[in-house]
C-alpha cells in the first residue's frame, strides 16, 4: 500500500515517452519514423493502459481505506520563499485518473483508424499523448501552482488539437477563439491563486483549506476580498468547462478531429473545470454567496445549452451544446453542495458522451466518402437520414448513448441525472422546475439528432437533384486527398424538383419536410440503382458504409460502460449488501444536502422520483418523434394536424413565436453577434490605436532623434570640412542673415 502511494508520482509521466520519441524520431530520422507511423499507436495505448491499471489499484486502496496520501518535495530558494511540488492521492484523483485513462485508451484505438488517411498522423498522436499527460498531471497535483502549470498545458494541447487542421481558416479561427476565451478565465484563476496565497500564506491544498477555514471561523479576513478571490478562482472553471458567459468557444471547437471532440468533451478539458470546482469545494463551501453564484451559473448554462441545441444542423455542434448543458448540471450540483451527485454525473456523462461523439465520427467518416472532406456537408444532419440499414452497429450504439443522455433506465446517465434532479428539489423549487424542464428538452434535441441521422431516407441524393447543384463538384480536403464526384447535367427529375427540401432544420414547421420526400421515394427507388432510364451510363449513387472493426470496437466497449457504469453509484443497501461503490470511495464526502443520510434509498421514493423524471424524458422523445419520425407523417396526410392547427386561435402569432425561438437558437442566442459588436469591435479599435501609438509615438521619438542627429552631423561635417569655399559660403550666409534681421 505504502509503496503504491509512493510510486504514484510517476503517473503523469508514464505516457510522456511517446511524444518525446516521436519528436526525436521526426527530428533525426524523419523518413523511418514516418514509414512506421502506424506502429506508434501501440506504445501509446500500452503506456496509458499501465496508468489505468495503476489508477484502478489506487481506487481499490481508496475504497478499502478511504485514506488521503500527500507527498511533497520542498525546493527552498531562500529563508522566506520555497516552492513545493508533490502529488495528492485521494478519491477524486482516483476517479479522474480512471476516467482519463479508460476514455483515452478507447479514443487512441479509435483514432488509429479514423486518422489513418491523414498526413499528420504522427503529430496527432503526439498531441493526444501529451494531452493525456497534462490532464493526469492536473488531477494528481497537490497545490495550486502545479494545478495552474498543468492547467495551462491542458489549454495549450486543446489549442493545438482544435486547430489541428490549421490550413482551414475556420479551424485556425476556432482554436484562437478557444485560446483567447480561456485566457480570460485563466487570468482570473491566476489572480485568485495569488489572492489566496496572500490570505493564507500557503498553496498546498491541505494547509490552504485548514488555514482558510480557521480564518473564516475567527472572522479574521475581509469577507468581500475573500469572496472576490473565490470568484476569480471559479472564473477559471467557467471558461474551461464552457459555462455561461465564457461558453462561446465550445461549438467552434468542433473544427478539430472528432476523436479529439470525444476526448475534450468526456474526460479532459471540460472535465478539468468540474475537477477544479470539486477540488476547491472546501474553500467555496464556507462562502454562501459563492455557492449560490455557482448554482446560478450552473442553472443558466443548463437552460442555455439545451435551448441552443434544438435548431443546430451540425451534428457535432449539437452534441457540443449538449455537453455544455450537462456540465451545467454538474456545476449546479456542486453549487447546491451535492458533491457525490456531481461526480457521479461526471462519470456517467463521460462514457455516454464519448460514445455519442465516436458514433458521430463513424457517421461523418462514412458520409465523407459521398460528400467529400467538407465539414459543412459531412456533418450536416440535413444531408443524412436513413442510415439505419447502412450502419446498423453505429445506429444501435448511438441509440444507446442517446437513451442514456435522455435519462432512460437502465442506462448510466439515468442514475446520475435523477440524483441531481432530486437534490434540486431540496435546494430550490424554482431551480428544480427549470432543471426538470431542461431534462425534457434534452430528450427532445437528442432524439432530434437520432431521427434526422438514422430515420427516413438519405437526403444527400435529393440535394443533388434539387436543381441548384446539377454540375460537377469537388470534395477538396486541405488535410487529405482530393476526390472528384461527377454528376451529369443531363439528369432532370421534375418530381424531385418540386419537392420542398429546405436545408433549414427547425424543430417545428421550418424543418426539412422529410415525410414529403418519403412519400415519393418508393416510386423512384429504382433511380438509385439504375440510371439507364435517363440515357446516362455509369451513373450510380453511393451510400454510407459501416465503419471498420477498429472504430466499432471502441464504440462497443463504450456501450458496455454506458450499460454498467451507473451501477457504481446505485444507492441501494439491502440486508447487508451495499452496492454504492461511489459513496464508499468518497468517504469522507462533502455533501450538504445529505449530511445525515446513510446513502440508501427506499424503493417507494426511488420509483416515485424515477417515474417523474422518466416521464419527462419520454414526453420530450414523443415530441421529437412527432415532428421528425417519418411514421408520423401519416397524421399530416390525414389532415389531423391541419384540423388541430385550425382550431388554434392566433395561429399567426404562434408561428411568429416559433420563428423567434428558432432564429434565437440557430443563431446561438445572438451571444456571438453581441460580443462581436460590443466587445470584439472595441478591442480591435483599441488594438489599432495601440499599434499606431507604438509605431508612431513610442518608436517615432527615438527614430526621430536618430534621424535628426544624422542630418545635424551631416550639416556640421560640411561646416568644418576644411574647404575655403564652404567657410566663405557660410560666412556670407550668416552675414546676410544678420543684416536682414537688423535692417528689416
From Swiss-Prot:
**Molecular function as annotated in GO:** NADH dehydrogenase (ubiquinone) activity; quinone binding
This protein's source sits in the domain of life called Eukaryota
Classification via InterPro entries? NADH_UbQ_OxRdtase_chlpt_su5_C, NADHpl_OxRdtase_5_subgr, ND/Mrp_TM, NU5C-like, Proton_antipo_N
Where exactly are the transmembrane stretches of this chain?
9-29, 40-60, 89-109, 125-145, 147-167, 185-205, 219-239, 258-278, 280-300, 327-347, 354-374, 396-416, 425-445, 552-572, 612-632, 724-744
Q: Which UniProt keywords apply?
A: Chloroplast, Membrane, NAD, NADP, Plastid, Plastoquinone, Quinone, Thylakoid, Translocase, Transmembrane, Transmembrane helix, Transport
Query: Looking at its record, which EC class is this enzyme?
Result: translocase
Q: Which GO terms describe its cellular component?
A: chloroplast thylakoid membrane
Q: Name its GO BP terms in alphabetical order.
A: ATP synthesis coupled electron transport; electron transport coupled proton transport
Stated membrane topology is:
Multi-pass membrane protein
Enzyme Commission number, as recorded: 7.1.1.-
Location within or outside the cell? Plastid, Chloroplast thylakoid membrane
Per the UniProt entry, the signal peptide is none
Q: Which reaction does it catalyse?
A: a plastoquinone + NADH + (n+1) H(+)(in) = a plastoquinol + NAD(+) + n H(+)(out); a plastoquinone + NADPH + (n+1) H(+)(in) = a plastoquinol + NADP(+) + n H(+)(out)
Q: What's one Pfam family here?
A: Proton_antipo_C
- NCBIfam families in alphabetical order: NDH_I_L, PRK06590.1
Query: Which family is annotated?
Result: Belongs to the complex I subunit 5 family.
Describe, as the record does, how this protein assembles with itself and its partners: NDH is composed of at least 16 different subunits, 5 of which are encoded in the nucleus.
Tell me, in a sentence or two, what this protein's role is: NDH shuttles electrons from NAD(P)H:plastoquinone, via FMN and iron-sulfur (Fe-S) centers, to quinones in the photosynthetic chain and possibly in a chloroplast respiratory chain. The immediate electron acceptor for the enzyme in this species is believed to be plastoquinone. Couples the redox reaction to proton translocation, and thus conserves the redox energy in a proton gradient.
Q: Which PANTHER family match?
A: NADH-UBIQUINONE OXIDOREDUCTASE CHAIN 5 (PTHR42829:SF2)
The protein's name: NAD(P)H-quinone oxidoreductase subunit 5, chloroplastic
Amino acid at each position: 500500500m505504502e509503496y503504491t502511494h509512493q510510486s504514484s508520482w510517476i503517473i503523469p509521466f508514464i505516457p510522456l515517452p511517446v511524444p518525446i520519441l516521436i519528436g526525436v524520431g521526426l527530428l533525426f530520422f524523419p523518413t523511418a519514423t514516418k514509414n512506421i507511423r502506424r506502429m506508434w499507436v501501440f506504445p501509446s495505448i500500452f503506456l496509458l493502459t499501465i496508468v489505468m491499471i495503476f489508477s484502478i489499484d489506487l481506487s481499490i486502496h481508496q475504497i478499502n481505506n478511504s485514506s488521503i496520501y500527500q507527498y511533497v518535495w520542498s525546493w527552498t530558494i531562500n529563508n522566506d520563499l520555497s516552492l513545493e511540488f508533490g502529488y495528492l492521492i485521494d478519491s477524486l484523483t482516483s476517479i479522474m485518473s480512471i476516467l482519463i485513462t479508460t476514455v483515452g485508451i478507447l479514443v487512441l484505438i479509435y483514432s488509429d483508424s479514423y486518422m489513418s488517411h491523414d498526413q499528420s498522423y504522427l503529430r496527432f498522436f503526439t498531441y493526444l499523448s501529451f494531452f493525456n499527460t497534462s490532464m493526469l498531471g492536473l488531477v494528481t497535483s497537490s497545490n495550486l501552482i502545479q494545478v495552474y502549470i498543468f492547467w495551462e498545458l491542458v489549454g495549450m494541447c486543446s489549442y493545438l488539437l482544435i486547430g489541428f487542421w490549421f490550413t482551414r481558416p475556420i479551424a485556425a479561427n476556432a482554436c484562437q477563439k478557444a485560446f483567447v476565451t480561456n485566457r480570460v478565465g485563466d487570468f482570473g484563476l491566476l489572480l485568485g491563486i495569488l489572492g489566496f496565497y496572500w490570505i493564507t500564506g500557503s498553496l498546498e491544498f491541505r494547509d490552504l483549506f485548514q488555514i482558510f477555514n480557521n480564518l473564516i471561523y475567527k472572522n479574521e479576513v475581509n469577507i468581500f476580498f475573500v469572496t472576490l478571490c473565490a470568484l476569480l478562482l471559479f472564473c477559471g472553471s467557467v471558461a474551461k468547462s464552457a459555462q455561461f458567459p465564457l461558453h462561446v468557444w465550445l461549438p467552434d471547437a468542433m473544427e478539430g478531429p472528432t476523436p479529439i471532440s470525444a476526448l475534450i468533451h468526456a474526460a479532459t478539458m471540460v472535465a478539468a473545470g468540474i475537477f477544479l470546482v470539486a477540488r476547491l469545494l472546501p474553500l467555496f463551501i464556507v462562502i454562501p454567496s459563492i455557492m449560490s453564484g455557482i448554482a446560478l451559473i450552473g442553472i443558466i448554462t443548463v437552460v442555455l445549452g439545451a435551448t441552443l441545441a434544438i435548431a443546430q444542423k451540425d451534428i457535432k455542434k449539437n452534441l457540443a451544446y449538449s455537453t455544455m448543458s450537462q456540465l451545467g448540471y454538474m456545476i449546479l450540483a456542486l453549487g447546491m453542495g451535492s458533491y457525490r451527485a456531481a461526480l457521479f454525473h461526471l462519470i456517467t456523462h463521460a462514457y455516454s458522451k464519448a460514445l455519442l461523439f465516436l458514433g458521430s465520427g463513424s457517421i461523418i467518416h462514412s458520409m465523407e466518402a459521398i460528400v467529400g472532406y467538407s465539414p459543412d456537408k459531412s456533418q450536416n444532419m440535413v444531408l443524412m437520414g436513413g442510415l439505419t440499414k447502412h450502419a446498423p452497429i453505429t445506429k444501435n450504439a448511438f441509440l444507446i448513448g442517446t437513451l442514456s443522455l435522455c435519462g432512460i433506465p437502465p442506462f448510466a446517465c439515468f442514475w446520475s441525472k435523477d440524483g441531481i434532479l432530486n437534490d434540486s428539489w431540496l435546494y430550490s423549487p424554482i431551480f428544480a422546475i427549470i432543471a426538470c424542464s431542461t431534462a425534457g428538452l434534452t430528450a427532445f434535441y437528442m432524439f432530434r439528432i437520432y431521427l434526422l441521422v438514422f430515420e427516413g431516407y438519405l437526403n444527400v441524393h435529393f440535394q443533388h437533384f434539387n436543381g441548384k447543384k446539377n454540375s460537377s463538384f469537388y470534395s477538396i480536403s486541405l488535410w487529405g486527398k482530393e476526390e472528384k464526384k461527377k454528376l451529369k447535367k443531363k439528369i432532370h427529375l421534375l418530381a424531385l424538383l418540386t419537392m420542398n427540401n429546405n436545408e433549414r432544420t427547425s424543430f417545428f414547421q421550418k424543418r426539412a419536410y422529410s415525410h414529403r420526400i418519403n412519400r415519393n421515394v418508393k416510386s423512384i427507388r429504382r433511380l438509385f440503382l439504375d440510371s439507364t432510364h435517363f440515357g446516362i451510363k455509369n451513373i450510380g449513387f453511393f451510400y454510407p458504409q459501416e465503419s471498420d472493426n477498429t472504430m466499432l470496437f471502441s464504440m462497443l466497449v463504450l456501450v458496455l460502460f454506458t450499460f454498467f457504469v451507473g451501477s457504481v453509484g446505485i444507492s441501494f443497501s439491502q440486508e447487508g449488501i451495499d452496492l454504492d461503490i461511489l459513496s464508499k470511495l468518497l468517504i469522507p464526502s462533502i455533501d450538504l444536502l445529505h449530511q445525515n443520510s446513510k446513502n440508501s434509498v427506499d424503493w417507494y421514493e426511488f420509483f416515485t422520483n424515477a417515474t417523474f423524471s422518466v416521464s419527462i424524458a419520454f414526453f420530450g422523445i414523443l415530441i421529437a418523434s412527432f415532428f421528425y419520425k417519418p411514421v408520423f407523417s401519416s397524421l399530416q396526410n390525414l389532415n389531423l394536424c391541419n384540423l388541430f392547427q385550425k382550431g388554434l386561435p392566433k395561429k399567426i402569432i404562434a408561428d411568429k413565436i416559433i420563428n423567434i425561438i428558432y432564429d434565437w437558437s440557430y443563431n446561438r442566442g445572438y451571444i456571438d453577434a453581441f460580443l462581436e459588436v460590443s466587445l470584439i469591435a472595441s478591442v480591435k479599435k483599441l488594438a489599432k490605436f495601440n499599434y499606431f501609438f507604438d509605431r508612431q509615438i513610442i518608436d517615432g521619438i527615438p527614430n526621430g532623434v536618430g534621424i535628426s542627429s544624422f542630418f545635424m552631423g551631416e550639416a556640421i561635417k560640411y561646416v568644418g570640412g576644411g574647404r575655403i569655399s564652404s567657410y566663405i559660403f557660410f560666412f556670407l550666409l550668416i552675414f546676410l542673415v544678420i543684416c536682414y534681421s537688423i535692417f528689416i
